[in-house]
Amino acid sequence: MFWLLALLAYLLGSLSFAIVLSRLSGSPDPRSSGSGNAGATNMLRLAGRKLAILTLLGDLCKGLLPVLLARAAGLDLHAQAWVGICAVLGHLFPLYFRFKGGKGVATAAGMLMALYFPAALLAIGAWLLTFYLTRTSSLAALIATPLTLPLLAWREPEALLPISVLTVMIVWRHRNNLRDLFAGRERHF
C-alpha cells in the first residue's frame, strides 16, 4: 500500500498548477519567465493575485491530500511523511513537465498541515513574518522550513527524518536564491 500511495503522491505532485494555469490564462510560462520558478510567488509576478492564489491552493492540496490518504489507509506517521515527500518530489521534478518544477514550499506546507498542524502554523507564521519584514519570499521559505524541526523532534519524532530530508530538498532548490541573497541581487516585492 505504501508504494502505491507514494507513486500516486508523486503523480499528483507532478501536476503543476502554475504551468497549467499559465497556459489556460495565456500568461507566460513561469519556468521561462520572471524568476523561472513554477510556483505561486512567480505567478503573482507574472499573472496576478488571482492565479497566484489558485496556484498556492493547488500546491497546498498536492501536499495535503496524499498524506490524508495515507493516514486513511492506516499508514503510520513516518510512512505518511514519506508519502508527502513523494508529492513534494513530484512538484520539484514533475513527470508531466520535463522534470522542471517549482521549489516545493507550498506543497511542503500542505504536507505539514496534514502531518502535524502546529508545525505548519509555525512555518506559515514564520514565513509571513519574515516576508513582511524583508519582502523576500525565498528568505521567508529558507527561515520558515527549518524552524519546524525542533517542534517535530519534540512532538512527533517519527516525522523528524523525513522532514529533515524535506528541509534539505527545499534549501537545495533555493541554492540560486541563497547565492543572490548573499550577493544582494535577490528579488523583493
Curated annotation (Swiss-Prot):
Cellular location(s): Cell inner membrane
EC code: 2.3.1.275
Topology of this chain in the membrane: Multi-pass membrane protein
Pfam families in alphabetical order: G3P_acyltransf (PF02660)
Associated pathway: Lipid metabolism; phospholipid metabolism
Segments traversing the membrane: 1-21, 50-70, 77-97, 111-131, 151-171
UniProt main location, coarse: membrane
GO molecular function terms attached to this record: acyl-phosphate glycerol-3-phosphate acyltransferase activity
Enzyme's top EC category: transferase
SMART domains: G3P_acyltransf
UniProt keyword annotation of Cell inner membrane present: yes
Reactions mediated catalytically: an acyl phosphate + sn-glycerol 3-phosphate = a 1-acyl-sn-glycero-3-phosphate + phosphate
Annotated keywords: Cell inner membrane, Cell membrane, Lipid biosynthesis, Lipid metabolism, Membrane, Phospholipid biosynthesis, Phospholipid metabolism, Transferase, Transmembrane, Transmembrane helix
An example Gene Ontology biological process: phospholipid biosynthetic process
One Gene Ontology CC term in the entry: plasma membrane
Family affiliation: Belongs to the PlsY family.
Stated role: Catalyzes the transfer of an acyl group from acyl-phosphate (acyl-PO(4)) to glycerol-3-phosphate (G3P) to form lysophosphatidic acid (LPA). This enzyme utilizes acyl-phosphate as fatty acyl donor, but not acyl-CoA or acyl-ACP.
NCBIfam families the record matches: glycerol-3-phosphate 1-O-acyltransferase PlsY (TIGR00023)
Record note on quaternary structure: Probably interacts with PlsX.
Name of the molecule in the record: Glycerol-3-phosphate acyltransferase
